[in-house]
Amino acid sequence: MAKLTKQAFVEALKEMSLLEIKELVDGLKEEFGIDPSAVAVAAGPAAAAEVEEKTEFNVVLKSFGDKKIEVIKVTREVTGLGLVEAKKLVETADAVIKENAKKDEAEALKAKFEAAGAVVEIV
């Protein structure tokens, strides 16, 4: 028996009807013992994990830039901290300003801090 090339196989498939292709697939499943439910179960959770979207974010102050006083004012306004606590927080490297914020709240905080001259990251 001559070896069938991939290209010849594809050309042969192009000439088949959908019913013939279905019968071919069913025959291959039977010949090689392929269980379609096992394939679907294995692929199911991975597909669900890809769709899952993060809903809570942390707003992290990376740098106060050259407007430290403005950033301290915004920090006090957002967190409700006193002057000394807000100053310490601003001076801390990678300080978390807000934890578990919703996406739109985190974006609003980022915009507010950036307007004051800070470098902020949402993680």
UniProtKB/Swiss-Prot annotation:
Keyword Ribosomal protein: yes
Superkingdom per UniProt: Bacteria
GO biological process, one term: translation
GO cellular component, one term: cytosolic large ribosomal subunit
CDD domains, alphabetized: Ribosomal_L7_L12
SUPFAM superfamilies the UniProt entry points to: ClpS-like, Ribosomal protein L7/12, oligomerisation (N-terminal) domain
The entry's keywords: Ribonucleoprotein, Ribosomal protein
UniProt keyword Oxidoreductase, yes or no: no
GO MF terms, alphabetically ordered: mRNA binding; structural constituent of ribosome
Known partners and oligomeric status: Homodimer. Part of the ribosomal stalk of the 50S ribosomal subunit. Forms a multimeric L10(L12)X complex, where L10 forms an elongated spine to which 2 to 4 L12 dimers bind in a sequential fashion. Binds GTP-bound translation factors.
Annotated family: Belongs to the bacterial ribosomal protein bL12 family.
Job of this protein: Forms part of the ribosomal stalk which helps the ribosome interact with GTP-bound translation factors. Is thus essential for accurate translation.
UniProt protein name: Large ribosomal subunit protein bL12
